[in-house]
C-alpha cells in the first residue's frame, strides 16, 4: 500500500493579487494561516483555482517556495504542475520539487489531448524523473480528456503515482477504478458536491474549492465520515449543496474570489482572460451576505478582516 500525501480536506487555494495584477504574497500568508487555523489538512497551490494558466514559471516557483517555507511543515503543500506539454510539466514538477513541495498535482494534457496510451507515457515519463509523489487530476469538463479506469490501473503500478483528484463526476467509473486499483491509488474527490458519495467508495478526502470560504465545514464533512459518523457527514454535504452550486455559477475561480472579497478577505480579481462574474452568474449566485451566513453556520472561523 502506498502512503497517501494527505488524508482529509485539502484546499485548492486561490492566488491573491494586488490591483495591478501582481501576486499579493502577504495575503497568501494570511490565507495559509486561516486555512491551518480552521483545520484544513493540506494546501494545494498553483492549480485551477489558483489560476495556474496565467502564472509565469517564476511566479509558479515562487508561490510554491513561499508557501512551503511559510507553512513550515504544519500541513503538506501540494503544487499544481499542469501543462499540456510533457517537457513543460516536467520543468514545473522539477521546480516544485526543488522548492520542497510534498506532492505534485498533475492534470491530463488539454487542448492537444492524447490517447489513453499517451496518458500512460506522459505521466510515467514525469514520474520516472521526480521523487515527489504525484496526484493525478482528471477533469474532462476542462481538458476534454478522461482517464479511464483501465488507464488508472496501469498508472497505479508506478511507485511515484500515488493518488488522483477525480472530478469527472462518474460514480460508476470511480467504483471500477477503486476495484481495479485498490490500495495502490488513493482517491480524492474533486467535486465539493460529491464528497460523501466518493468516500462511500473509499476516497480519503477532497481537494476543495469550497474550503476557501468554509474550511472547517469541509474538514468536518470528511472527518466525520472517516470517524464512522456517516449521518453527520451526509447532513453537512446536503447543507452545503446550494453553496457548492453557487461557487460554480461562473467559471472557477471567479465566483469564489468574489465571495471571498465580499467577506472582506481582499484576494483581488482574477487575471485575464477571466473577468468579473457575469450577470447570468449573478442571477444564479447567492448574494455575498447569504454566502457569509452559510459559512458562519458551519461553525468556522470569521473572515480575515474581522
Each language-model region and where it sits:
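Glycine-rich phosphate-binding "P-loop"
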Residues: 138, 160-161, 271-272
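Active-site beta->alpha loop and helix N-cap motifs at the rims of alpha/beta catalytic domains
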Residues: 2-11, 15-144
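A general structural signal for well-ordered alpha-helical segments in protein cores
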Residues: 28, 60, 64, 89, ...
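Catalytic cores of TIM-barrel enzymes
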Residues: 2-5, 38, 176-179, 185, ...
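Helix N-cap/beta->alpha junction signal
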Residues: 85, 191-192, 278
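Alpha-helical structural signal in soluble globular domains
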Residues: 62, 66-71, 95, 99, ...
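C-terminal alpha-helical cap/extension of soluble enzyme domains
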Residues: 5-16, 34, 38-40, 200-203, ...
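Catalytic alpha/beta core domains of metabolic enzymes, predominantly
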Residues: 128-129, 142-248
Amino acid at each position: 500500500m502506498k502512503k497517501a500525501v494527505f488524508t482529509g480536506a485539502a484546499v485548492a487555494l486561490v492566488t491573491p493579487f494586488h490591483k495591478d495584477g501582481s501576486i499579493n504574497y502577504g495575503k497568501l500568508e494570511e490565507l495559509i494561516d486561516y486555512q491551518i487555523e480552521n483545520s484544513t489538512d493540506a494546501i494545494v497551490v498553483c492549480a485551477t483555482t489558483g489560476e495556474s494558466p496565467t502564472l509565469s514559471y517564476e511566479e509558479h516557483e515562487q508561490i510554491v517556495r513561499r508557501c512551503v517555507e511559510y507553512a513550515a511543515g504544519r500541513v503538506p503543500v501540494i503544487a499544481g504542475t499542469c501543462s499540456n506539454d510533457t517537457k513543460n510539466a516536467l520543468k514545473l514538477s522539477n521546480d516544485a520539487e526543488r522548492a520542497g513541495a510534498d506532492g505534485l498535482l498533475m492534470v491530463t494534457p488539454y487542448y492537444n489531448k492524447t490517447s489513453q496510451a499517451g496518458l500512460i507515457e506522459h505521466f510515467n515519463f514525469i514520474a520516472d524523473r521526480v521523487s515527489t509523489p504525484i496526484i493525478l487530476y482528471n477533469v474532462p469538463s476542462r481538458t476534454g480528456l478522461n482517464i479511464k479506469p483501465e488507464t488508472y490501473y496501469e498508472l497505479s503500478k508506478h511507485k511515484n503515482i500515488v493518488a488522483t483528484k477525480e472530478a469527472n463526476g462518474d460514480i460508476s467509473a470511480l467504483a471500477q477504478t477503486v476495484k481495479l486499483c485498490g490500495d495502490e491509488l488513493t482517491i480524492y474527490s474533486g467535486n465539493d458536491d460529491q464528497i460523501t458519495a466518493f468516500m462511500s467508495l473509499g476516497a480519503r478526502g477532497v481537494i476543495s474549492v469550497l474550503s476557501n470560504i468554509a474550511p472547517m465545514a469541509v474538514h468536518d464533512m470528511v472527518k466525520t465520515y472517516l470517524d464512522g459518523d456517516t449521518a453527520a457527514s451526509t447532513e453537512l454535504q446536503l447543507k452545503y449543496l446550494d453553496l457548492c452550486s453557487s461557487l460554480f455559477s461562473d467559471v472557477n475561480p471567479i465566483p469564489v474570489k468574489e465571495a471571498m472579497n465580499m467577506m472582506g478577505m481582499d484576494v483581488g480579481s482574477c487575471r485575464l482572460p477571466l473577468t468579473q462574474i457575469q450577470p447570468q452568474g449573478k442571477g444564479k449566485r447567492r448574494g455575498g451576505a447569504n454566502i457569509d451566513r452559510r459559512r458562519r453556520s458551519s461553525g468556522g472561523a470569521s473572515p480575515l478582516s474581522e
